[in-house]
Amino acid sequence: MASTSMSLTRACKVHAVLACSIPSVSSAFLTTNVTFLGQPVEMPSQRWSQRRCSRPGPVTVRAEEVKEVTQAKGLSRESGGQWLSCTTRHVRIYAGYVDPETQVMDQSQLDKLTLMLDPDNEFEWPEEMVEKVYDKYRELVETYAGADLTEYTLRLIGSDLEHYIRKLLLAGELKYNLDCRVLNFSMGKPRIDPADLDDVEVEE
């Protein structure tokens, strides 16, 4: 298991990025900037989406400029050559920067955490639901501020975020995507209130 001596700090700055790397799959990326070796590092981000966003996005970066920095540097294990990650069914967290267009990881930007949300597109993700998950992610990063940046720490964050997604589903705020390539209802079958159905009598 690879690890680095980097720590999460409370002075982290979060940038949200939406990406549609494959026409049939809509993924969400969230890159978190933290201080590295005591120096704050900022990275402007860009918002991509198949549908028009209602709110203005963050600072725009030209695609060719992003691709120039998104390259593997061949660093050693001591320098982070073995990328840290957390992978669950709907949450993937990487220590590094992932280009939302090419999905290539920049191995030199080890001061960032990148969140990939629901890569299989199992749920429908309206803008407000994406923001809710982002807010929870920011909260979890702040909660674990100061902890060593290890795969164990990333798994704690990823597991908590996975439980939060399940909570949204059970509360009826999040819905399954019925156009998903595979419908296996990984978090339980949909629950329907009979009172919401037409021509159905509900006994008191």
From Swiss-Prot:
GO CC term (a single one): chloroplast thylakoid membrane
Enzyme Commission (EC) number? 7.1.1.-
The entry assigns this protein to a family as follows: Belongs to the NDH complex subunit M family.
The record's section on InterPro entries has: NdhM
Q: What is this protein called?
A: NAD(P)H-quinone oxidoreductase subunit M, chloroplastic
| UniProt catalytic activity | a plastoquinone + NADH + (n+1) H(+)(in) = a plastoquinol + NAD(+) + n H(+)(out); a plastoquinone + NADPH + (n+1) H(+)(in) = a plastoquinol + NADP(+) + n H(+)(out)
Instruction: Give a single Pfam family match.
Output: NdhM
- What top-tier enzyme class does this entry carry? translocase
Membrane topology, as annotated = Peripheral membrane protein
Task: State if Cytoplasm is listed as a keyword.
Answer: no
Q: Which UniProt keywords apply?
A: Chloroplast, Membrane, NAD, NADP, Plastid, Plastoquinone, Quinone, Thylakoid, Transit peptide, Translocase, Transport
Whether Translocase counts among this entry's keywords is yes
One annotated GO molecular function is:
oxidoreductase activity, acting on NAD(P)H, quinone or similar compound as acceptor
What GO terms describe the biological role, i.e. biological process, of this protein?
A: NADH dehydrogenase complex (plastoquinone) assembly
